[in-house]
Amino acid sequence: MDPEHAKPESSEAPSGNLKQPETAAALSLILGALACFIITQANESFITITSLEICIVVFFILIYVLTLHHLLTYLHWPLLDLTNSIITAVFLSVVAILAMQEKKRRHLLYVGGSLCLTAVIVCCIDAFVVTTKMRTNLKRFLGVEVERKLSPAKDAYPETGPDAPQRPA
């Protein structure tokens, strides 16, 4: 294959790999919640749902670490990440609400529920990041100029000097 016809590698990291702190944070929070649920001998459904979510997150991490997402091109991986984040947030929010009702009787179960609730927040942040990346890539594909603001404080401090715009009096 000619080097000029070669497909350039994307320098952008995939949305679900370990370079994104949301994935590692969600995995550690769900592992902590699972440990709390196992120690308190919680309802089997709590343990099952959290262990299922751990398996799904580990599956996505393995896909990205082994770079299998480049081989399976018929799947739109960012959309699959978005769907996973939304479904994880829904399931873990149900577990968190049900587990946090046991505050007065079993405190460690309440801690597990609060860890699940924190994992829900992290999954929502991950879904927002994936959606933003998808929208940026779609705009770039369609040829729409993508405007990036580096800092919102940049507009707050106007330039000073002889070439700076003057305020109307």
From Swiss-Prot:
Gene Ontology biological process terms in this record: chemotaxis
Keyword Transmembrane helix attached: yes
InterPro entries on file: Marvel, MARVEL-CKLF_proteins
Lipid bilayer topology: Multi-pass membrane protein
Subcellular location: Membrane
Transmembrane helix is among the record's keywords: yes
Gene Ontology MF: a single term: cytokine activity
Tissue: Highly expressed in testis.
Domain MARVEL: 17-135
GO cellular component: extracellular space; membrane
Keywords, in A-Z order: Chemotaxis, Cytokine, Membrane, Transmembrane, Transmembrane helix
Transmembrane segments: 22-42, 46-66, 79-99, 110-130
Family: Belongs to the chemokine-like factor family.
PANTHER family referenced in this protein's UniProt entry, alphabetically: CKLF-LIKE MARVEL TRANSMEMBRANE DOMAIN-CONTAINING PROTEIN 1 (PTHR22776:SF43), MARVEL-CONTAINING POTENTIAL LIPID RAFT-ASSOCIATED PROTEIN (PTHR22776)
Name of protein: CKLF-like MARVEL transmembrane domain-containing protein 1
Gene (UniProt): CMTM1
